[in-house]
Amino acid sequence: MKPVKTIAMVYRETGTCGGIQRGASFQVGQFGEWGFEPVVLSESDLGRGPGRREKLAAAIRGRGVDLVIEHDAYAEEKLSADIAATRDAGVPIIVFWHSVFSWMVANGSRNAGAIFDLLRRADAIIALTSADETFFRMIGCRSLAIPYCDADLMEGFERGGYPHRVLWMGRFVGLKRPLDAIKTVERLRETVRDAELVMLGDGAAGSRAALEKYVRSRPGLRGAVRFEGFRKDVRPYLESAGAGLVTSKFEGFSHATVEMKMASLPVVAYSMPYVETLAEGTGAFQVPQGDVDAAAARLAALFSDPAECARQGALARRSYEAIRSFDQRGAYGRLFADLEKPRSASSLTAPDASRVRLVAETLLEHAGMGLDASAERISRKLSGGGLLAALRRLSRWWR
């Protein structure tokens, strides 16, 4: 393998992939600062159907690319074409896995096995947590955990207090469970009368309207929930909040959690023990998945003790500073150097034995989520009349 100078990054279209777009954009600037030459390729350059393989291989040769980093690893056809293209062009490919390792399992995705088989063919996987790193090594991949290192949005800010304002940030989609955030604050207001919720984000047409309808139907929530939509500048909302809330089914890294920690906010989150930013002693508290009562109780306990809020906020800020101090450049240098070795001689293939149990438990939990997700899809099809309508059409044709 020749020395890495020009790096091509493959990702989805701008504005369609949330954290993936954000991570890829950050990486472009990062590599540029380090003296590499980044080349950005998206679907507008490569397409997503026949011909993608040839287009990527031609771009690699034409632009003198030494290494490809794949940020769009979740569609079987595209990932297969991109791996094949790098083989055609004779350069290594690293897959940047932005999600938790069992994201596809938790979603009930039927092509999860095919994606994992393709990942084994990649030269390496960049993971976001040690649990993800361990999983990919368990299935035979060369992998290294390199967490995001978001810029400090709160530089110069000194927190003066912890108002009873809960901040939730994310997309209005099922896996983020925005309705659970509203229900949590509804319970919280039974003991903390002036508690309120600020929601930053948006979603598909009708998703916000459904949430607003729920709020209007609950007298106890009048004036207590603010829908602020998507905001690029989140600092004012971080400054004015007193605690963060994360109600996700699963996360790969959770930018929202890190931003809350930048602002010295304690964070209450649904249990995701594989996410290191939610570890005990880092200003974060995990409660059982889907348990809005437990989330409300934890927020109430924090708000009832301003000194504890301040202590946990300080831990949260230190947790962010620890992430920020991670040696990103050294980690990438180690990964690039390891690519020069055969996989059998790699130092990045042995799983961390201390995390194997956590990986196994997470896979089992997420397999259960996947079964539930598949059952919900089948139920929606039946209740929506898709199968029944087809049977009726067939019956009419037969008669």
Predicted regions span which residues?
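Aromatic "clamp/platform" in nucleotide-sugar-dependent glycosyltransferases that forms part
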Residues: 230, 249
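Short hydrophobic beta-strand element within catalytic cores of glycosyltransferases
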Residues: 266-269, 276
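Conserved acidic donor-binding segment of nucleotide-sugar-dependent glycosyltransferases
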Residues: 284-292, 301-306
